[in-house]
C-alpha cells in the first residue's frame, strides 16, 4: 500500500480518468484444491499467490478513497459474488468483467442486478463462445 499514492499521483498527472482494479477474495473464488497446486516457478501454491496479491477490504477501500480524492473514477473487476457485494456497498460507478469470466453467467447475472454499467472483456474468446 505504501506505493499507492505515488502511483495514483503519477496516473493523475498523466491524465488518467478511471482507475481499474481487481477485487480478489481468495476464499470465495478458490477451492481447497488450489492449495495443492504449486506452479514450477514458485514455492507458493495458487491459493497463497492470489491471497498474497489481494488487498484487504480496508486497504482496497482506502485505495478507492484516494483515487476519488484525486478526481478519478474507481472501478473494479470482481471475481466472486462476495467481491461484487463489496464493490456494490461502495457504490462504484461500473463493473469490469475479465475475459476469463465472460462465460461466468451466474456472476454476470448477479452483477446485473446492481443496475450499473458493465465493461465485458472477451479476450481471445470467439463470438460463438460468448453468446
Language-model segments: which ranges?
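Glycine-rich anion/phosphate-binding loops
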Residues: 1-10, 56-58
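Active-site glycine- and acidic-residue-rich loops that bind
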Residues: 1-4, 119-130
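Conserved, mostly hydrophobic/aromatic
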Residues: 11, 87, 121
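Active-site beta->alpha loop and helix N-cap motifs at the rims of alpha/beta catalytic domains
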Residues: 40-105, 113, 127
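Catalytic domains of carbohydrate-active enzymes, especially glycoside hydrolases
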Residues: 6-24, 91
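Conserved beta-strand positions in the central sheet of alpha/beta enzyme cores
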Residues: 18-20, 76, 96, 119
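Glycine-rich, proline-tolerant flexible connector loops at the mouths of alpha/beta enzymes
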Residues: 17-55
Amino acid at each position: 500500500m505504501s506505493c499507492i499514492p505515488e502511483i495514483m499521483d503519477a496516473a493523475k498527472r498523466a491524465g488518467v480518468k478511471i482507475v481499474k482494479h481487481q477485487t480478489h477474495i481468495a476464499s470465495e473464488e478458490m477451492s481447497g484444491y488450489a492449495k495443492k497446486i504449486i506452479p514450477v516457478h514458485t514455492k507458493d501454491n495458487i491459493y497463497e499467490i492470489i491471497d498474497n496479491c489481494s488487498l484487504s477490504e480496508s486497504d482496497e477501500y482506502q485505495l478507492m478513497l484516494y483515487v476519488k480524492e484525486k478526481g478519478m473514477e474507481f472501478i473494479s473487476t470482481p471475481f466472486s459474488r462476495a467481491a461484487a457485494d463489496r464493490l456494490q456497498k461502495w457504490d462504484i460507478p461500473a463493473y469490469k468483467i475479465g475475459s476469463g469470466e465472460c462465460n461466468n453467467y451466474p456472476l454476470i447475472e448477479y452483477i446485473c442486478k446492481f443496475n450499473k454499467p458493465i465493461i465485458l472483456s472477451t479476450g481471445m474468446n470467439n463470438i460463438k463462445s460468448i453468446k
